[in-house]
Amino acid sequence: MGYPKEGETIQIQSYKHNGLIHRIWNETTILKATELCIIGANDRTMVTESDGRTWMTREPAICYFHAKQWFNVIGMLRDDGVYYYCNISSPFATDEEAIKYIDYDLDVKVFPDMTYNILDEDEYADHKRQMNYPKEIDSILREHLNTLLHWIHQRKGPFAPEFVDMWYERFLHYTK
């Protein structure tokens, strides 16, 4: 598996457990890429849904992917603070085309005061049944949801107070 290079622009591709494409973010600038972690950033990038509909993101975002965690984190810079959208997902894979992961439906929305809501539990239950998620996957996803909530409470990793601002500053160097 090759890793994207710092400064390179690449897609992010989200799939479902059945292998079908879920969503594509057209352009993300790579800020850091190692075998353990990829950090990227985008601002007003085109997103294509599985049904072909498109929309544009509204604000700058820092995207955090970890090779050993079954979640990824998007920190969105808004006027009233940093909001986070966390996808419970497979660890990332990369190729020359994109950062890729399997989206497992459960999401966590985190507000600037670090309170959060767990989203899409009904969708997770439906897809778990429809796509026959193995018990092992269900167990891993629940464990990593708990890890994610711990990271939020501890302000660890992408939830650290300076994390999003620091990486956004680096992103600005590529947009000049």
From Swiss-Prot:
Keywords: Hydrolase, Magnesium, Metal-binding. The keyword Magnesium applies. It catalyses: a ribonucleoside 5'-triphosphate + H2O = a ribonucleoside 5'-diphosphate + phosphate + H(+); a ribonucleoside 5'-diphosphate + H2O = a ribonucleoside 5'-phosphate + phosphate + H(+). GO terms for molecular function: magnesium ion binding; nucleoside diphosphate phosphatase activity; ribonucleoside triphosphate phosphatase activity. SUPFAM superfamilies: FomD-like. Mg(2+) 2 binds at D105, D107, D120, E123. Its cofactor is Mg(2+). Its EC number is 3.6.1.15, 3.6.1.6. It comes from the Bacteria. Mg(2+) 1 binds at N87, D103, D107. InterPro entries: DUF402, FomD-like_sf, Ntdp-like, SA1684. The active site is at R23. The keyword Metal-binding applies. Has nucleoside phosphatase activity towards nucleoside triphosphates and nucleoside diphosphates. Belongs to the Ntdp family. This is Nucleoside triphosphate/diphosphate phosphatase. It comes from Bacillus pumilus (strain SAFR-032).
